[in-house]
Amino acid sequence: RADSTCVDSAAAPAAAEGVIAQGVAAIMGADCSGVTGAIASNVAVPNGVVMISPSATSPGLTTLDDKGYFFRTAPSDARGGQILADITKDRKVKSVAITYTNNDYGKGLADVYKAAVEAHGIKVTTVNAHEDGKADYSSEVATLASAGGDAVAVIGYLDQGGKGIIQASLDSGAFDTFVLSDGMIGQSLVDAFGKDLKKSFGSMPGSTGKGSGVFAGVAKAAGIDSSGPYTGESYDAAALIVLAMQAGGSADRASIAKNVMDVANGPGTKIYPGELKKGLDLLAKGKKVDYEGA
């Protein structure tokens, strides 16, 4: 295990190199889009190591030259941005300012969201990047406030600059309605701002299929909150690696890459969260499986 940092695309490959040097068969991760792309391009793909990210959502990763070694279990922001725009329209927002964390995830989602809200007839007053890791965001909020808007869309991270944007907005009275990207969704934000978020809304990936319901039960039995951001997607990423190993009868890196798509799709016996033993047993007998994720 190694820390990809989420925000440092220079340090992340070094962390991944250390893991690969230990002879790992595959990588579950990374988390954020920028570091995921850096690790995939510079470390994982050149070394023939499968990566399955549960949470890297940048549209740019769709066209990554991954040679068949990169996968993800979360949908692209190409869809997520449209959903967030649809919700913005439903909330009858007429104008919105946009601020995004200055990385691949932030820029990609901001571009999709801007185009989608404008297609709904919503005015975008300004689009500005913000840097993570600052102690104060009053200057960034002042710029957003000068452009105006019924709300400000905060595309970022709840423990980084995104939280700082909200704090500075509330302190100055610039905005009281926040449109939150998936990276901003989490209990810590509610704990920090409570009722000050009562006008705010956001979106995060999820599923209403059978696998989602099954996973909720499995997670509850294990004392895990299944509603947390990318919890189900993380389970799915690990499950696919294990099933791909069994399908090929080997922890060989090339074998895993060859079998990921086979176990993730039909034909085959449906395997749901909590049924990995069943799936492994079927694969050991030469049968096909179709993993239906959380």
Role assignments for model-derived ranges:
Residues 1-294:
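Extracytosolic ligand-binding ectodomains
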